[in-house]
Amino acid sequence: TKYYGNGVYCNSKKCWVDWGTAQGCIDVVIGQLGGGIPGKGKC
């Protein structure tokens, strides 16, 4: 699992946001097969 900042984590299958870690930031995460790409967040 890789941490991208602002509460965004990705592994080989999906990305997700830990809202506790994000602390109110809004992140757009696009999951792709074989990985994910974190979008630009707005805090």
Curated annotation (Swiss-Prot):
> Which terms are listed as keywords in the entry?
Antibiotic, Antimicrobial, Bacteriocin, Secreted
Kindly indicate whether the keyword Secreted belongs to this entry. yes
Coiled coil ranges (UniProt) are: none
Query: Which BP terms from GO are recorded?
Result: defense response to Gram-positive bacterium; killing of cells of another organism
Temperature-dependent activity: Displays a high degree of stability when incubated at temperatures of up to 121 degrees Celsius for 60 minutes.
Pfam families this protein is in?
Bacteriocin_II
Biotech relevance, as the record puts it, is:
Has potential for use as a biopreservative for inhibiting L.monocytogenes in seafood products that do not usually undergo an adequate heat treatment.
Give the GO cellular component terms, alphabetically: extracellular region
The protein's location, in the record's own words, is: Secreted
The record's similarity note reads: Belongs to the bacteriocin class IIA/YGNGV family.
Q: What does this protein do?
A: Bacteriocin with antibacterial activity against many strains of L.monocytogenes, L.seeligeri, L.welshimeri, L.grayi, L.murayi, L.ivanovii, L.innocus, C.divergens and C.piscocola. No antibacterial activity was detected against L.lactis, P.acidilactici, P.pentosaceus, L.salivarius, L.delbruekii, L.acidophilus, L.plantarum, L.casei, L.rhamnosus, S.thermophilus, P.freudenreichii, B.breve and E.coli.
* Name assigned to this protein: Bacteriocin divergicin M35
The organism is Carnobacterium divergens
